[in-house]
């Protein structure tokens, strides 16, 4: 009943693009010819079809550009480990669809954590080189993970933080050389003071190792294969060995 009064419809998590209620609401908007609504989404962009319905075809009915905030924390097998259930090939395909769509704009949101701190420049370079992120793109938001503390960048030992800092500087230089705006680069710069604001390896290393052991056992994955750059940090504690 409220659809005629809508100006903005913001669909947040879990994952709105695979919920029945979302499609019912979109159908009602179209049926009532209320298609001047600004649609905004938080999504992991894993699914653009639901029960054979293509969201892009529905979006074509709307006059205002659709805004998609894509939650992506890395690429390849690292992305699949960080967000369980992710299929990277599908994410790549859907990024291309978003880039190609005429009435859709998208912005990347990334959680900065121990999982991507030592390879963040590789992720940015991939996104930039494939034109998923350009100097004309909306700002790519980088969120500093605060909790759980044992998976934040604070848990990195000092020598690893030196590498993480180098990764941030490499990303800043690459973006600067390509003409990215200060607002784009500021997101990277804000991670520098955060990286060194706490040093928690000694108090959190056991919890970190227990968490990785739990994840690998539960999912049948291998942290050391996926994150060789962090492998030396992870040795199964004696209390968890067979």
Please give the residue ranges for each predicted region.
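A structural motif corresponding to the C-terminal end of an alpha-helix
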Residues: 2-5, 62-63, 94-106, 171-184
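Core AdoMet radical
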Residues: 4-20, 30-52, 59-92, 105-114, ...
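Well-ordered, non-membrane alpha-helical segments in soluble/globular domains
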Residues: 22-26, 51-56, 88-96, 120-125, ...
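Short, well-ordered alpha-helices that flank and scaffold nucleotide-derived cofactor binding pockets
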Residues: 27, 31, 129
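Acidic (Asp/Glu)-rich catalytic clusters
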Residues: 56-65, 99, 128-131
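Flexible glycine/acidic-rich beta-alpha junction loops that bind and position SAM and/or redox cofactors
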Residues: 112-118, 135-169, 181-193
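Catalytic cores of alpha/beta
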Residues: 114-131
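Radical SAM enzyme core and accessory elements
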Residues: 169-242
